[in-house]
Each structure stands twice: as C-alpha cells, then as structure tokens.
Amino acid sequence: MKTKPLPTAPMAWAESAVETTTGPRELAGHAPLRRVLRPPIARRDGPVLLGDRAPRRTASTMWLLGIDPAESSPGTRATRDDTEQAVDKILRGARRAGGLTVPGAPRYHLTRQVTLTDLCQPNAERAGALLLALRHPTDLPHLARHRAPPGRQTERLAEAWGQLLEASALGSGRAESGCARAGLVSFNFLVAACAAAYDARDAAEAVRAHITTNYGGTRAGARLDRFSECLRAMVHTHVFPHEVMRFFGGLVSWVTQDELASVTAVCSGPQEATHTGHPGRPRSAVTIPACAFVDLDAELCLGGPGAAFLYLVFTYRQCRDQELCCVYVVKSQLPPRGLEAALERLFGRLRITNTIHGAEDMTPPPPNRNVDFPLAVLAASSQSPRCSASQVTNPQFVDRLYRWQPDLRGRPTARTCTYAAFAELGVMPDDSPRCLHRTERFGAVGVPVVILEGVVWRPGGWRACA
C-alpha cells in the first residue's frame, strides 16, 4: 500500500516561527497567523535577503520602541527605513513629555499660585525674591481660642485681621467666608512690617520705604502697620507666625491684572536653573534684605570654607504689651541638629526675657490648690499607700499611689518660653558660597541687599526653640 506524503505547509509555518525570511507580500497575507506563531520580541537571525525581500530587523528593539512591523502596510514599510521610524517614535514621545531631557541638567520644580497683591506685589519685586505662603486668615481666630493661655485676649487677633482687611484691595467686599482667601506674603513685606525690631534700623527703614513707595496706592503704609499689629497679636495669643507660614519658593516670573497676580516660583532645586523670561536678567539669584540676613558662622566665629545651609528663622519677644516678631535668613555650616544651640547663643537675651516675662498677664490658679507636691505629708502618714521598688512595674500597686494633678495655669511652659523657630530652606553647595552685599535700586529707593548665588532649595519642617 502506498502512503501519501505529509503536507509541507505546516512545516513551512513552523519554520516561520524561527526564521523571519517571509517577504512583505507573503507577510501581509498571514499577519494574524504570524502573530500567533512568532512572538513580537523574537529575534530574526540569518543572512541578509536580496531582491524583493524586506531588510532584516531586530524585533526586540522594535518592541521596546513600541513599533510592530506587521501593523504597517507593505508600501509604507518599503519606503520608510527602520531608523526613521525609531526617530519619529522617540520624537513623538519627547513631544508628549514636554521636551527632551538634557543629561546632567539640574532638576527643579516650579509652583504657581494666584494671589492678591496686598501682601505680595510682584511688579515691585525682582526675580529671586523669597515668597511665603500664608494660611487662610479665617483659621487664625479658631487657633487663638485653643492655644492662648488663660487670661489672654483672644479677640485681639480677630480684630487685627479685620482691620487689615479693611485696608486691603478687597476690603469693601470681603469673601463670603468673611475674610480674604489664603495667599502669598513677600519676604520684603514681612521684613518691612517688622522693621522696628531689627538692629540695623536704617536698612530696615529702607525696606519699609521701598514697600510704601513701590507697592502702589495710598493704603500700602496702612497695610504695613496693621499687618505688624497682626504679628504682635499672633505672638500675644501664641499663634506664632511660623505655624501659619511656610516657604513657597523663589520668585521667577509673574503675570498681574488689577489686584491679582499669577506667580511662578522655584520651590525645589536650583534657583538659577530656570529662565526668568526677562532679557536683562535671564537668571535669578536669591535676594535678601541686608537687615534680615545673618551669617551665623561669622557672628560666632565658627567654621571655615565649605558648603553652607540656609535657614528661615523667626524670633519672638513675649513681654506684656511689648510683643515683637522678627524674621531672618541665616547662613551657616551647622546642620539642623546643631543650629538650636547656636541660636540660643545668638538670641540668648530673648530666651531669658521670654522665660521671665512669658507667663505675665495670665490667669493664675486659685491659691492653695495643689501648688506643691505633698511629699512631706505623704511620708509622715502611715496610712498613705506605698510601693516598693520591685513593685513599680506592677499596675496593681502603682494605681494605689497618690496622684498629683497640679494646675499649670500661670506657670512657664514651652510655648511661653519660645523665643525662636527655624526651618531649613536649602543649601549653597559651593566650597566658597558667594554672598554679595550691595545696594539695589527699587524705583527711587535704594535698599541694601545680600545676593546669594548658587542656592539650591530644599525646604524642611519647623522646629521651635524654647
């Protein structure tokens, strides 16, 4: 009996799973079958085909780029080269991502916010100015009622903010919540409001003159005075300014319209990495008023050449009817864990003043109400429960001991002794950080400033010093 030979077509199909020698015309007719028998990432090995055969391609590379040769028509595949397809694919991806990434370029992050121009007027500032974000003012009276010591006037803070809003651009028509929205505060405006607390009085008054002259309107001076009263009321009610303000970024560009401004700032990374859009000043260095800049290493004769940290520091004086707030940018080689001891040495007088006078004007507890721990009475009485050293860890014996619950009203606490608070802003990574002291012209007013070059923003959290 004669046997029929096996069909050869399945063998041809099986070979196509290993060898990729099928021409364009044959491949076009069996595209679905080809996807089943040969995965897209299979390599195509073998000699280069001649004639009307398609050029060999590396399927793994095409798969990584997201290109499937079977999805394109034979005419397109014959006219376009693999390299051209790959370049087009890369360019399309880069265009969707927003641009090509240059290897080794510094990474930075931009942030943007629309704010009122009452406390931050970008047209009067320059690129590189420091900006702070302020918590919504409606939260402050509630915080005052929870944090103010007994006897303090909590309504003082609400009245101060109400008077500030009356002098603002939207004072005649407040928001539906009864207060303006949260916004930004320029560091220069904050320094001008605290001008009376700085030792360099002439430089601080120059900053105040710049704000009152260039912020526009006749109510700029009134806003400064009322904002200064708000800061004093915050210290009085223990709603410290550092608890309602945070670092926003270094000013880069802005767009203003009427009493609103859209502000763009660098919140992380090098300040000078982005373009400002101004031909005269394409890059922005950090600019700080000279009265609010402290070189801590030079003040305390510490350290030598090397990289330095930048800190934002608030200082407070808690004395009845003499509350003061001050803000600084401190440069030091000390890390955050070692800065508190240096600030204690620099602002030691404030620390002593707050420890002595911070508890004034507070309602004391009633007399003879658990003022002192009755150790002598308990020791003399044989009826008082006792516990040996071996029974301290046993709740059965510890719970029987006398419980002393003193009334701490009128006594010094950590908040009454708080004299400063600091947060890390960033670093100056150069071995010899450049701090240029000069006088900059803001309109018709000359202001002594310090220009910090090479600042890399790296903001951190707040730490209170008491």
UniProtKB/Swiss-Prot annotation:
Record's keyword annotation contains Acetylation: no
**GO annotation, cellular component aspect:** host cell nucleus; viral capsid
* One GO molecular-function entry: DNA binding
Disulfide partners = none
- Which GO BP terms sit in this record? viral capsid assembly
Looking at the record, which segments are called Disordered?
A: 1-29
What is its subcellular localisation? Virion; Host nucleus
Q: Which Pfam families match?
A: Herpes_VP19C
Which InterPro entries does the protein's record reference?
A: Herpes_1
Alphabetical keyword list: Capsid protein, Host nucleus, Virion
Does the keyword field hold Glycosyltransferase?
Answer: no
The family classification in the record reads:
Belongs to the herpesviridae TRX1 protein family.
Q: What is known about what this protein does? A: Structural component of the T=16 icosahedral capsid. The capsid is composed of pentamers and hexamers of major capsid protein/MCP, which are linked together by heterotrimers called triplexes. These triplexes are formed by a single molecule of triplex protein 1/TRX1 and two copies of triplex protein 2/TRX2. Additionally, TRX1 is required for efficient transport of TRX2 to the nucleus, which is the site of capsid assembly.
> Could you give the subunit structure recorded for this chain?
Interacts with TRX2, MCP and capsid vertex component 2/CVC2.
Q: What's the protein here called?
A: Triplex capsid protein 1
